[in-house]
């Protein structure tokens, strides 16, 4: 269980440090979701059966997040010419 927390914190650190490309931000978010999913899987293996439904919902949301993130990446890279976060006007 400690390793899942460590993976989550590494992904959070990567999210904070890699602010250049949109794809790297999406990969860090996906790594955070996978670590949460694995953590819920470890809890359900240890004897508690109620997180199993939550894990399935989390897996569904992470699949939707990945597909919408990749669609957004394609849209932005076609309209702006690159996926650099510094080239976006977020204000």
Swiss-Prot record:
It is found in: Mitochondrion inner membrane. GO terms for cellular component: mitochondrial inner membrane. It catalyses: a ubiquinone + NADH + 5 H(+)(in) = a ubiquinol + NAD(+) + 4 H(+)(out). GO terms for molecular function: NADH dehydrogenase (ubiquinone) activity. The chain crosses the membrane at residues 2-22, 38-58. Keywords: Electron transport, Membrane, Mitochondrion, Mitochondrion inner membrane, NAD, Respiratory chain, Translocase, Transmembrane, Transmembrane helix, Transport, Ubiquinone. Its EC number is 7.1.1.2. It is an enzyme of class 7 (translocase). It is a multi-pass membrane protein. Its main location: mitochondrion. Core subunit of the mitochondrial membrane respiratory chain NADH dehydrogenase (Complex I) which catalyzes electron transfer from NADH through the respiratory chain, using ubiquinone as an electron acceptor. Core subunit of respiratory chain NADH dehydrogenase (Complex I) which is composed of 45 different subunits. Belongs to the complex I subunit 4L family. This is NADH-ubiquinone oxidoreductase chain 4L. It comes from Branchiostoma lanceolatum (Common lancelet). The lineage of its organism: Eukaryota, Metazoa, Chordata, Cephalochordata, Leptocardii. The gene is ND4L.
